[in-house]
């Protein structure tokens, strides 16, 4: 390391001869030259950097944050990017320098250029590549003072034929690992957030803290609907985050599958249809819920809330247009989630996956289908059951050996779950029946979910707990 030196130069009137002055000055020059020859530069190590920016925005990037041995009195050199302009902010200490990048008008896609970090003498340098992805401006239109709009197309969530459900730029598809049963309706889910905003992690089993302006989009449909075996989209539900909280808006699709119209009165509707699945013809009188029915399940301490987008439900892979990726990581990469997640997340399993542990499948099924009501803040908060995934490691919270609150004819002395005997278990009866008075869940289904009945019955039959 270069040592600090102080040199003194005396003048003749201080008593030294001109020869002495020349000698001292020569000594100073020799000393400085000799000092530079003994200088050992640091081994500067730079690393590649990446960033994303919208066409109409400016990106600030700390390109030195992941570099090593950056000299405080060094220098930084930028090559000229092709699709934008780049500059370095003023600094006192080189480590404080930031890159500012502005895309050219109309430019999109990837822009790469090189930056170099050198010491003050230019003797030691290192360079790396900066890659900037320029994103087009999202076409989504959302004015919180004017929503809900009268028709779904006003939002521009989808490009091309809206029935194809091809998301516009910035509209990100997602799917919970374990999905809600809704009379065998299929679903497509999407999330959109305003530019520059993101959700925050709260806990594994709690809803992400979404920013104002975020929208959750959920479309319900059936394939192979008779008589023409076509896809029929029934409704698209929006959950919009306003300053005062979440807001529901339901859009009912027309018969031509060209547009969806706001359910202005919030009454909902019944849609009878037949569809073919696995070679079997099925009938459902599908219920588009009223606003009050939506609120029954989508509430927490009397406030409207989404159900599914929790880290425990999103910590799995999804097949995006550009490849398979973990959903939480995709949200982070998109800018929709801050990168502040714990290293381990208590994650549900896909209840339909027969390769998973049977008890985990049961707990995951109850979490997505029942926990929104059976929680401290839900519609059934007065009940003993607590069916969220993190609570059901205690099987009493599912109902094992628990007495029912409401008597049911024929089950007067039964437990909610009688270990080893599904047919004698009240909870199994509620899942099995389609009687509106007794079925569980109360809303969202009119048909029996045969696939869940099979593995839940197997789980109950294999329980060996002895009730008091």
Residue ranges and their predicted role:
Residues 109-121:
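A short beta-strand micro-motif common to beta-rich folds, especially ectodomain repeats
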Residues 138-202, 210, 221-223, 232-263, ...:
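Conserved small-residue
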Residues 104-108:
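Short, surface-exposed loop/turn segments at beta-strand-coil junctions that are enriched for proline
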Residues 58-102:
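Surface-exposed or secretory-pathway low-complexity segments enriched in glycine-proline
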Residues 1-41, 467-468:
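Bacterial Sec-dependent N-terminal signal peptides
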Residues 32, 207, 225-468:
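Sequence context surrounding c-type heme c attachment/ligation sites in exported
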